[in-house]
């Protein structure tokens, strides 16, 4: 099975270490463009753009990077309750048209009650999922060319329609992640691809089976994806040393404050991430080569695959055997790690090489010359 590998745009900040300003770097448009262009050239299929008040706006970031990339797709957040589904459908169609069919959409219900209240959304967890189902039903139908009347508990529209259709037909794909029963019900009914954060394979297998069964009851099939960090090096020892360095500036007070902040979230997925490490730095390898250190201070995806290329590839294939075909990776710092993952991991996976124009001698395709006039040896076949 050919895998879809995505990268990640760190619009909330980037650096060499977690929990400190040391080694941090400014995430401006130039830096985001560097990461997007690297991902485009290296053969990543797309990039996930995060959402929330700690991030730059995902739609504006995507729109600004369309002109500086060629093949890269942009996975952008849809926020039910914060925007009208009809307006969101128009925006989605425009982004798809302007990007020449490079727009993908990620339904995000939100998990931080404080942030949601600041955005004017005062719904409980259950009510947010009710509203998200209504939003998605309208959004899909409008994008597919229907004129929609809908009288829901949370959303009412009359004569909602779209005059400029998307390029992707019947509409761009919809991604979504959530661990609660309500989230799985929504995924089974509404989305093309269900995402999970990087839990141990047995836990992921259970979630996939649940969503697959619920989708089958509705006569649907759903694809599956996973969101993971990656720390890959030439040897396993180097990879684990890099993992240790990433959290080398963390102290228990910083971890405790981060976990206290995340504890207010009503996201089941966030609770499952926190349970993997319990706020402690011992026993962070929660499954072979699956390391929970990132989640000590980072919300959302909190686990990383750690090892050399063949080892990480074996773990990726373990998830793929469960039915996952899409992997959304990231690493710190995101520019350098996009190259490491492509160079050290891709050769061991079924990933299509990036399309490149035929070289005509304007740039050297072989690496740096040796002693001015000697070509370097060709790389050994993987």
From Swiss-Prot:
It holds the Pfam family Bac_luciferase. InterPro entries: Alkanesulphonate_mOase_FMN-dep, Luciferase-like_dom, Luciferase-like_sf, SsuD_RutA_monooxygenase. GO terms for molecular function: alkanesulfonate monooxygenase activity. CDD domains: Alkanesulfonate_monoxygenase. The keyword Flavoprotein applies. It is an enzyme of class 1 (oxidoreductase). One of its GO terms (biological process) is alkanesulfonate catabolic process. It catalyses: an alkanesulfonate + FMNH2 + O2 = an aldehyde + FMN + sulfite + H2O + 2 H(+). Keywords: Flavoprotein, FMN, Monooxygenase, Oxidoreductase. Its EC number is 1.14.14.5. Catalyzes the desulfonation of aliphatic sulfonates. Belongs to the SsuD family. PANTHER family: ALKANESULFONATE MONOOXYGENASE, ALKANESULFONATE MONOOXYGENASE-RELATED. This is Alkanesulfonate monooxygenase. The gene is ssuD.
